[in-house]
């Protein structure tokens, strides 16, 4: 697994007040860094690599709080901010182009895209069926304040910030990261998506046996 790389670079830029268009100018450089890091890992002898993409950041409490608006058209059917998710799609599209180039440059290695974006959207869209609280899907478990239980100046870890009673019923832990239960289910989706693409005989035979 190479990364995830770039998420904190974008987070920092957004928190410095840069616009989406300004942050988009960073994406080619970030993707090139990921590509070079992957090539370096290949140089160390790796033959099967997973390179993960970006989450749909417009679905996360931290961004829903920072960019909250009364404009209903800014949100999609899952109540995610469309412009921010489009930013993630832009990053992921460039990353998949870079992975295609890596495959051409290293035909003897298997390089697979880790689709964090669609894994999380699956989790969010099926959350009520998976045992999560449907009234708190975009509220932080560890947080305080606002519609998303996330305070821009009161973060998880502050003695004044409470924790929800049952984290296993929440997707978001602290507004930025997921709960262990959410990560577990997302990982299950990713494994099922990635394993067939890794071209590993043991994995194929094991998958067909379970």
Residue ranges: model-predicted function:
Residues 189-197:
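C-terminal alpha-helix
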Residues 26, 30-37, 91, 95-98, ...:
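Stable alpha-helical elements in mature extracytoplasmic
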Residues 179:
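Short, conserved phosphate/pyrophosphate- and ester-handling motifs at nucleotide-, phospho-/glycolipid
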